[in-house]
UniProtKB/Swiss-Prot annotation:
Record's protein name: Glyoxylate/hydroxypyruvate reductase A
PANTHER family: 2-HACID_DH_C DOMAIN-CONTAINING PROTEIN, D-ISOMER SPECIFIC 2-HYDROXYACID DEHYDROGENASE NAD-BINDING DOMAIN-CONTAINING PROTEIN
Residues at the active site: R227, H275 (proton donor)
InterPro entries the record matches: D-isomer_DH_CS, D-isomer_DH_NAD-bd, GhrA_Enterobacterales, NAD(P)-bd_dom_sf
Entry GO terms, CC: cytoplasm
Pfam families the UniProt entry points to: 2-Hacid_dh_C
GO molecular function: glyoxylate reductase (NADPH) activity; hydroxypyruvate reductase (NADH) activity; hydroxypyruvate reductase (NADPH) activity; NAD binding
Keywords, in A-Z order: Cytoplasm, NAD, NADP, Oxidoreductase
Gene: ghrA
Length: 312
């Protein structure tokens, strides 16, 4: 069994050593331009077209939860990967736990009004504020995949009303499910906190725009943990300035790194982190990949395969 590996920023030697230990029967090598030798599996992130083109692969693993970059490259270069080759993504591998930590900490930050107290502190103002009531602090999750499910589970501990919206209806205990465009307005109408965990597809680009934000309750909060292209930044800034949206916590942006001149940096109601909400944990990723390859070799059914038509 031959495995080729390519990632522009990861510690390649660490990965090769870990993969060889996890899959002793495999010959693992770092792919370099000009390497056209045979391979059974490819582990990639932002791969060059020539790495995958023309190869008779058993499967390709994207080294992250999102596959929008490789799918967009496939649209421009369909010869890059044969359509029958399955493409897998890292559905969790520790990212679910990180998303839970991020979402819970920020929801509680808003619920306890720490954002308001920070603004008061900036003006040396001492004033206790009325508390929010949990039953009025409904949290809505846009995107009901593996990570959305994990975030919902973590928030249930705090007894907030929960709802989710996705392409198809879900049956999550304690979570009200909405599905399809026809139910989006009803979903948004009660969301004091909107958490975005949608996949990046042509249908979801720009979905968080003026029209969507207007359907939220006044003074709602936005937590974007998915992709920057989901948010029309000018529309969000207008909603923040008007008070329609009271605060936003943003981990992802249309341009990354976020340019220094972006007005988001200086907005008093915006908090920024540099795309760190959920980072691939190498040891857990290697365990998932080695387990999945073993299942594929046995002809077993596996999880995490990407539907290229849907985009996730």
């Amino acid at each position: 069994m031959d495995i080729i590996f390519y990632h522009p920023t990861f510690d390649t030697q660490w990965w090769i050593k870990a993969l060889r230990k996890a899959i002793p029967q495999a010959r693992v090598r770092a792919w370099k331009s000009g390497d056209n030798d045979s391979a059974d599996y490819a582990l990639v992130w932002h791969p060059p077209v020539e790495m995958l083109a023309g190869r008779d692969l058993k499967a390709v693993f994207a080294l992250g939860a999102g596959v929008d970059s490789i799918l967009s490259k496939l649209q421009a270069h369909p010869e890059m990967l044969n359509p029958y080759v399955p493409l897998f993504r890292l559905e969790d591998t520790g990212m679910g736990e990180q998303m839970q930590e991020y979402a819970v900490s920020q929801v509680l930050h808003w619920f306890r009004r720490f954002d308001d107290y920070r603004i008061q502190q900036n003006s040396s103002h001492w004033q206790p504020l009325p508390e929010y009531y949990r039953e009025d602090f409904t949290i809505g999750i846009l995107g009901a995949g593996v990570l959305g499910s994990k975030v919902a589970q973590s928030l249930q501990t705090w007894r907030f009303p929960l709802r989710c919206w996705s392409r198809t209806r879900k049956s999550w205990p304690g979570v009200q499910s909405f599905a399809g465009r026809e139910e989006l307005s009803a979903f948004l109408s009660q969301c004091r906190v909107l958490i975005n965990l949608l996949p990046n597809t042509p249908e979801t680009v720009g979905i968080i725009n003026q029209q969507l934000l207007e359907k939220l309750p006044d003074g709602a909060y936005l937590l974007n943990l998915a992709r920057g292209v989901h948010v029309v930044e000018d529309d969000l800034l207008a909603a923040l300035d008007s008070g329609k949206v009271k605060g936003a916590m943003l981990d992802v942006f249309n341009r990354e790194p976020l340019p220094p001149e972006s007005p988001l940096w200086q907005h008093p109601r915006v908090t920024i982190t540099p795309h760190v909400a959920a980072i691939t944990r190498p040891a857990e990723a290697v365990e998932y990949i080695s387990r999945t390859i073993a299942q594929l070799e046995k002809g077993e059914r596996v999880c995490g395969q990407v539907d290229r038509a849907r985009g996730y």
